[in-house]
């Protein structure tokens, strides 16, 4: 068991070290998200399985608050409305589970973040 735990931490360290190399890309994405929100846009989130839960968490942090008190930010998890999701799947198929919602709710300048 100890060996498995150590291996897990070594793998975790390797992932963290590789993320440092993405700092420029992460900054670019963050700037796009900030620009969207400053222009009264909405950030939409989607994912499946555990990533669906992550999308709901991230949307919640923007609408609620993450650090410090601030105005709520426009953010919607496309994984949160089971009635809409099951209707779309039933009528159109899984292929349109998120795109149909973006067509209904999205506007030019909004951003969709897919998590996997």
Question: Residues of each region from the PLM?
Answer:
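Glycine-rich, small/polar surface segments that engage phosphate groups of diverse ligands
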Residues: 35-106
């Amino acid at each position: 068991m100890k060996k498995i735990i150590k291996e897990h931490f070594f793998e975790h360290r390797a992932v963290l070290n590789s993320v440092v190399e993405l700092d420029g890309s992460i900054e670019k994405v963050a700037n796009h998200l900030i620009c969207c929100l400053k222009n009264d846009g909405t950030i939409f989130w989607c994912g499946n399985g555990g990533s669906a839960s992550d999308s709901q968490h991230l949307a919640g942090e923007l609408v609620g608050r993450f650090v410090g008190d601030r105005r709520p930010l426009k953010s919607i998890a496309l994984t949160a409305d089971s009635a809409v999701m099951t209707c779309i799947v039933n009528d159109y198929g899984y292929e349109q589970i998120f795109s149909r919602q973006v067509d209904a709710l999205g506007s030019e300048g909004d951003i969709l973040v897919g998590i996997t």
